Curated annotation (Swiss-Prot):
The active site is at H199, K672. It comes from Nostoc sp. (strain PCC 7120 / SAG 25.82 / UTEX 2576). The lineage of its organism: Bacteria, Bacillati, Cyanobacteriota, Cyanophyceae, Nostocales. This is Phosphoenolpyruvate carboxylase. GO terms for biological process: carbon fixation; oxaloacetate metabolic process; tricarboxylic acid cycle. It comes from the Bacteria. Forms oxaloacetate, a four-carbon dicarboxylic acid source for the tricarboxylic acid cycle. Its cofactor is Mg(2+). HAMAP family: PEPcase_type1. Belongs to the PEPCase type 1 family. It is an enzyme of class 4 (lyase). It holds the Pfam family PEPcase. One of its GO terms (molecular function) is phosphoenolpyruvate carboxylase activity.
Length: 1026
């Protein structure tokens, strides 16, 4: 077929074995892809795709002549041919993604085994500081600029990945003389939390993901067969047979619908997210702990490893109700039950396997009295099990014990199923486990008996580790709701009760805080059991009540975080605390609660205000007492009002980490609000100021990073992003969202999942112990402040002040078509009814710019800010920016993300969208907007190349550069198809013929389906949605 591999096909003998393997895999995929298309669509379709791709250069930049030629080809297609072409390109991208994932997993396996013998300092370890004494010159810094690609491994990124492992980290800490007691203190409090979200939901159907996993499995089988053949083993026909199976599987994939046939429900999204636990993480997390423990022991054998749940998971799927009316209290309850169902089924499977494994007989092994005593108790409680199995297992105590354990698990599962269905359990009196700790105690009893009699069981140890990590809940559920929902609910409640002389929403902030503070010092309830309010207010009240019910049924850990989106002031936090009090989640008399209120600061103004808001909260005695675990743990006097009963009712016991405040920072809305550079700088500043406030008040801080999948929403390599954070703001604690769109790329394969978790953990440790100090250089901060302000001004000048921009956005991008994709239970717009930028969510905003190859939110404004700075002192300021890039992790992270995004931009393709999709009367205006955007792109590109000293974008990362080029050349013809379909779709209301588009008789539904298929394909090619 026309050269899909482009430059990859040249000089094969010059490349190392790892790249030859990748090239071999790409060739196999190319052949399979062509074979499938030939069998399913005919040779004419194969020839067409060759022609379209041959018109596009490897770099993906379509010239004017190429665009004209490609469009002429596309004009001649009927709708079925256009859809087939779009599907073919989409299939190609998804196959390439699979090959890259398989290659990366193979590389991780190879590198991890090699790390034992040789380790190297981590990137960013230069110029670090700790309490130990070491010379800055002892740490070698290598920029890696201008290095010959052929002299390296195929992946420059691979070397960085090698350094993101435990096996490389601990020798580095030793080399830099970091005091072991500091390492131990950090490890003891290590807390890495990853929170799965459903927005944006993965655009690829679950059914298609199943097909992709089959392809992955077959490719791995092919790898094994080929390796055996190299060693002279196996049979010559085996590889051919696997290739035939691959061809069959891809043909089945081709005949499967790519588009969701219905809008997924919230529980569909829950099932999708939990799939990664079922397939990978449930077994993978114990391996992560083992890697940590082993690597630590190799360098610091006297240090204690962290707790097994140092890396834990949370979820918003089924509990995040911000802007999603489909997430109801009932859905959140069902989500918790669903999670428990999954984890119980895994435990049941494991215990069943242990029964087969632990066939130890009392004829040949001793048994301790405590196990025999527990068997007597089990017999009295589960006589049916004893009657059925006592004879069979009369000399096998471990099997009998595990049979009792299995029955209790099954009873627990049956009760949970009834709760899921909303029914009253009929087996309440049956012996079962009320918590994971009860199950864990039984497993430890068995483990103790084995150990004391000289035995061990790896499968049992793994199960114990899983229970310690996942408990009976699998993940913790975070509740999230928008701040005005709480104030509106209180407004209605207080109006009904006639407690205030004026509506609550009319009160000033000072009046609200004063009233809320007073009300939070009494146990007097405001809300009765009956709810005579509107549905929206009742939903808010019921949400708090279901949290209380969840904690009572599943334990407090299931749901103890309540996030307030669009948090702007102190009253936003106190309102949630008051509603929590009404649900008995907070006892004001003793200031003890079982819920942690987390403010989420999203816009630039809110980020700038966050320091003041948190200071005011920390000044409130009741809030400080809540953080401390009650008045008894503070010097604050217990308030004594006439409304506080002298004999309090039973109160919740605080299980919150003492003096820990979690604060969430939003990347998406701040970027949409002020642009990439300003957003990143404001978040960076907010972290520093929040940590300073926390230290001032003796509070521990955990920053929750609301990162998206794309650069425009905070995405990008997590390792580098964490190292770029202000070190003092981490201190061994971090919480990060993992967006639904990136779950497949990070967690579909075990070794990739382990690598991702390992790099995040090592980055947290490194950023906490090894600090550059550059974040505290005031002149550098002043320069960044100036750059951010200039960037923001230029960005907002286009987005919010250019009068033609909103019309430009709606006509030139497929925003309206994206909103019709059945990929998420959440609406694309906030419920304001307006079609302006303020109501549009950040996810479809970024998605639209990605489809049209502008990727505008991830770079616009950066070039102008840099140019204005350079204009002041061109040579000196360029030297300074280069120095920042080399020395300052934050600045390097920002520039690297911009560079990566610019490499994916195709301004010629973007111009084609403008020319073809603009209404004739609007085209002159829109061409001026496009010219402004294009000028900023070229300016930004040129200045980034100057700062990085690269000849081309991504010269410092050849693998990413090749990966982007490999996709760009094929995305261009797919973009042409999308434009043609969108143009005809938007003009389908007119019966007149339209020039320059696909000619055929077709319905609007057919056109929409075709357009949506191209959106799918481009998303796969760009490797993200929003």
């Amino acid at each position: 077929m026309g050269s899909v591999l482009y430059s990859l096909s040249e000089s094969a003998n010059l490349y190392p074995a790892s790249e030859l393997f990748l090239r071999h895999r790409l060739q196999i995929v190319e052949e399979l892809w062509e074979s499938v298309l030939r069998q399913e669509c005919g040779q004419n379709m194969v020839d067409l795709l060759r022609q379209l791709r041959d018109l596009c250069s490897p770099e993906g930049q379509a010239t004017k002549d190429q665009a004209v030629s490609a469009v002429k080809l596309i004009e001649q297609l009927n709708i079925n041919e256009a859809i087939r072409a779009a599907r073919a390109f989409a299939l190609y991208f998804q196959l390439i993604n699979i090959i890259e994932q398989e290659y990366e997993q193979r590389q991780q396996l190879t590198r991890y085994s090699d790390l034992e013998a040789e380790t190297a300092p981590l990137n960013g370890s230069e110029n670090i500081t700790s309490s130990s004494n070491h010379n800055e010159d002892d740490v070698i810094f290598n920029r890696g600029l201008g290095t010959d690609f052929l002299g390296k491994n195929w992946t420059n990124r691979g070397q960085g990945k090698q350094k993101g492992t435990f096996a490389a980290l601990f020798p580095l800490l030793s080399k830099l003389n970091v005091p072991p007691q500091q390492i131990q203190r950090l490890i003891s409090q290590l807390d890495v939390r990853l929170v799965f979200t459903a927005h944006p939901t993965e655009i690829v159907r679950h059914t298609i993901r199943d097909k992709q996993r089959q392809v992955v499995d077959l490719l791995q089988q092919l790898d094994e067969v080929e390796n055996r053949a190299k060693d002279g083993g196996g049979y010559p026909w085996e590889a051919g047979e696997i290739r035939e199976k691959l061809l069959e599987e891809i043909r089945l994939w081709w005949r499967t619908d790519e588009l969701h046939q219905f809008k997924p429900t919230v529980l569909d999204e829950v099932d999708y997210a939990l799939h990664y636990f079922q397939e990978v993480l449930f077994d993978g997390i114990p391996q992560l702990y083992k890697r940590f423990k082993y690597a630590l022991n190799q360098t610091f054998s006297w240090l204690e490893p962290p707790s097994k749940d140092f890396c834990s998971f949370g979820s918003w799927v089924g509990s995040d109700r911000d802007g999603n009316p489909s997430v109801t209290p009932e859905i959140t309850w069902q989500t918790a039950c669903y999670q428990r169902k999954m984890v119980l089924e895994r435990y049941i499977k494991s215990v069943t396997q242990l029964i087969e494994l632990l066939s130890i007989s009392m004829h040949w092994s001793d048994v301790l009295p405590d196990l025999l005593e527990s068997l007597e108790l089990d017999q009295s409680q589960l006589s049916e099990v004893y009657d059925a199995l006592a004879l069979r297992y009369r000399q096998e105590p471990y099997r009998l014990k595990l049979a009792y354990v299995l029955k209790r698990l099954e009873n627990t599962r049956d009760r949970n199923l009834a709760l899921y269905k909303g029914e009253t359990p009929t087996n309440e009196d049956s012996p079962m486990y009320r918590s994971g700790s009860e199950f864990l105690a039984e497993l430890r009893l068995i483990q103790h008996n084995l150990t004391e009699t000289g035995l061990s069981c790896r499968e049992l140890d793994n199960l114990i580790c899983q229970v310690e990590i996942f408990d009976f809940n699998l993940t913790k559920l975070d509740i999230r709701q928008e701040s005005t929902r709480h104030s509106d609910a209180l407004n209605e409640i207080l109006d009904y009760l006639q407690l205030l002389p004026q509506p609550y929403n009319d009160l000033s902030e000072e009046q609200r805080v004063a009233w809320l503070t007073t009300e939070l010092q009494t146990r007097r309830p405001l809300i009765s059991s009956e709810l005579p309010f509107s549905d929206k207010t009742n939903d808010v009240i019921k949400t708090f009540r279901v949290v209380r019910s969840l904690q009572q049924e599943f334990g407090i850990n299931i749901c103890q975080t309540y996030i307030i989106s669009m948090c702007r002031q102190v009253s936003d936090v106190l309102e949630v605390l008051l509603l929590a009090k009404e649900a008995r989640l907070f006892d004001p008399a003793i200031a003890v609660g079982t819920i942690q209120v987390v403010p989420l600061f999203e816009t630039v103004e809110d980020l700038q205000r966050s320091r003041s808001v948190m200071r005011q909260l920390f000044e409130l005695p009741l809030y400080r007492a809540l953080l401390a675990g009650g008045y008894k743990n503070t010097e604050v006097k217990v308030p004594n009002t006439e409304l506080t009963p002298q004999s309090p009712a039973p109160s919740p016991q605080s299980v919150l980490t003492p003096d820990l405040q979690e604060v969430m920072l939003g990347y998406s809305d701040s970027n949409k609000d002020s642009g990439f550079l300003s957003s990143n700088w404001e978040i960076h500043k907010a972290q520093k100021s929040l940590q300073q406030i926390a230290e001032e008040y003796g509070v521990n801080l955990r920053i929750f990073h609301g990162r998206g999948g794309s650069v425009g929403r905070g995405g990008g390599p997590a390792h580098e992003a964490i190292l770029a954070q202000p070190g003092h703001s981490i201190n061994g604690r971090i919480k990060i969202t993992e967006q639904g769109e990136v779950l497949a790329s990070k967690y579909s394969l075990l070794d990739l999942a382990l690598y991702n978790l390992e790099t995040i953990t090592t980055a947290v440790i490194q950023a906490s112990l090894l600090r550059t100090g550059f974040d505290d250089i005031e002149p550098w901060n002043e320069i960044m402040e100036e750059l951010a302000a200039r960037s923001r001004q230029h960005y907002r000048g286009l987005i919010y002040e250019q009068p033609d921009f909103i019309d430009f956005f709606h006509q030139v991008t497929p925003i309206e078509e994206i909103s019709q994709l059945q990929i998420s239970s959440r609406p694309a717009r906030r419920p304001s009814g307006k079609k302006d930028l303020s109501s549009l969510r950040a996810i479809p905003w970024v998605f639209s710019w990605t489809q049209t190859r502008f990727l505008l939110p991830s770079w616009y404004g950066v070039g102008t800010a840099l140019q204005e700075f350079f204009n002041e002192e061109p040579e000196e300021h360029l030297k300074l920016m280069r120095y920042f890039y080399v020395k300052w992790p934050f600045f390097k992270m920002v520039i690297s993300k911009v560079e990566m995004t610019l490499a994916k931009v195709d301004m010629q393709m973007a111009g084609h969208y403008v020319q073809e999709l603009s209404d004739p009367e609007d085209k002159p205006r829109f061409e001026k907007v496009f010219e402004q955007i294009a000028n900023e792109y070229y300016l930004t590109r040129d200045l980034v190349l100057k700062i990085t000293d690269h000849g081309r974008l991504l010269d410092g990362d050849p693998v990413l550069q090749r990966s982007v080029q490999l996709r760009n050349g094929t995305i261009v013809p797919l973009g042409f198809i999308q434009v043609s379909l969108l143009k005809r779709l938007r003009q389908s209301k007119n019966n007149t013929a339209t020039s320059g588009v696909i000619h055929s008789r077709y319905s609007k539904g057919e056109l929409l389906r075709g357009a949506l298929l191209t959106i799918n394909g481009i998303a796969a090619g760009m490797r993200n949605t929003g």
